[in-house]
């Protein structure tokens, strides 16, 4: 009996030895069908430390030979004088007079057809601006090809032609949007981001080499909480942010590439949630594409070129509230334009997405500066699981 058991043990040992030898001869161990398969790199996350419209430096911005646009106070001086006197009287008594008071003309910021066109001044001359060529042509006012409306393109800082930025045509003769004025100073300090107005995230997937990679994917997502700043007021790197719980703000993934440190993407639409000061709204950009430079410290800086939906642009400029009181008129007054003027001027400068029935363009080309710093992007499902 004992001899029989010994033979069984010897047979099992021999079988195990054969299996081991056969396993060693295989090109790949069991369970690894392709040991040479490369593992995809983990996604890289970023948060925007800068995100603002292009306002050219003063030496490149061009001139407004007919001056700047007027405000309602300039256009309706008698009614505004009566309203202001009553406003100051009530303020001294601890009261408040709303901006849509009957002493003023009908509020065109709430109903843009409530006032006539005041003759809004657009910027019609040459300028040197940052931006991208969105339509693939050096457009001229005398004509346009399919997919756009006639407009004069700008020149870029490296001599390139065909830069599409009709937003500067619209706002270039508004005093508050001129170089070194109100909006430019707010942009310089990234005020809207740092004060908690919005946090915009970016995630890049498939980036094997930050300097050269012929196939990456880029996605922009709104965050559900403000950015984190250090004691000096600068955005902190490598902070975790949770993406917005509403997937409406998890935008379409854009295919892209990196060549010699220059990142570019194909066009996609995206929406950005913003809740800052008197605005609770979203930005809607169409056919947006990025061109950025990867920096040695991991940041990415560059330009977004996009078409800003015209109706959305008017809404973000004028749909402002403090409690029950509409503040669009207040915002327009402080920046230096009339809502009726902006409304009537927008179709004149619009250059993208022609309406199939009327042929009129419904979006306005724009350029935005961005600076993305390394961060960790957490999806809402993962955040809840934690």
Q: Which role fits each region the language model picked out?
A:
Residues 21-23:
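C-terminal motif of bacterial Sec signal peptides marking the signal peptidase cleavage site
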Residues 27-386:
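Extracytosolic secretory-pathway proteins
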Residues 4-5, 19, 363-365:
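Generic secretory/membrane-interface signal
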Residues 3-13:
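Bacterial N-terminal signal peptides that target proteins for export
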């Amino acid at each position: 009996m004992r001899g029989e058991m010994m033979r069984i043990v010897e047979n099992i040992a021999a079988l195990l030895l054969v299996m081991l030898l056969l396993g060693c001869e295989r090109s790949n161990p069991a369970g690894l069908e392709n040991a040479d398969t490369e593992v995809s790199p983990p996604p890289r996350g970023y948060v925007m430390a800068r995100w603002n419209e292009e306002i050219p430096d003063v030496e490149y911005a061009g001139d407004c030979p007919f001056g700047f646009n007027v405000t309602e106070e300039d256009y309706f001086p008698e009614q505004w004088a009566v309203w202001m006197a009553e406003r100051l009287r009530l303020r001294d008594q601890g009261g408040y007079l709303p901006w849509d008071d009957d002493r003023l003309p009908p509020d065109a910021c709430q109903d843009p057809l409530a006032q006539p066109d005041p003759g809004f001044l657009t910027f019609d001359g040459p300028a040197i601006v940052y931006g991208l060529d969105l339509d693939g042509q050096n457009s001229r006012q005398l004509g346009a090809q399919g997919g756009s409306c006639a407009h004069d393109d700008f020149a870029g800082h490296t001599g390139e032609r065909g830069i599409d930025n009709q937003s500067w045509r619209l706002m270039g003769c508004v005093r508050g949007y001129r170089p070194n004025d109100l909006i430019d100073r707010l942009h310089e300090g990234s005020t809207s981001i740092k004060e908690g107005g919005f946090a915009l995230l970016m995630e890049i997937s498939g980036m094997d080499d930050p300097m050269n990679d012929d196939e990456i994917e880029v996605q922009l997502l709104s965050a559900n909480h403000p950015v984190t700043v250090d004691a000096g007021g600068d955005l902190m790197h490598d902070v975790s942010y949770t993406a917005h719980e509403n997937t409406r703000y998890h935008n379409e993934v854009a295919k892209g590439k990196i060549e010699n440190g220059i990142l570019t993407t194909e066009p996609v639409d995206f929406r950005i949630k913003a809740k800052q000061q008197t605005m609770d709204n979203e930005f809607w950009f169409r056919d947006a594409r990025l061109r950025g430079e990867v920096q040695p410290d991991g940041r990415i800086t560059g330009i977004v070129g996009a078409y800003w939906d015209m109706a959305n642009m008017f809404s973000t400029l004028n749909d402002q509230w403090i409690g029950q009181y509409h503040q669009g008129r207040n915002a327009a007054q402080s920046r230096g334009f009339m809502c009726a003027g902006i409304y009537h001027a927008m179709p004149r400068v619009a250059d993208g997405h022609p309406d199939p029935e009327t042929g009129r363009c419904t979006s306005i080309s724009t350029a935005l500066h961005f600076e993305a710093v390394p961060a960790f992007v957490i999806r809402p499902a993962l955040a809840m699981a934690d």
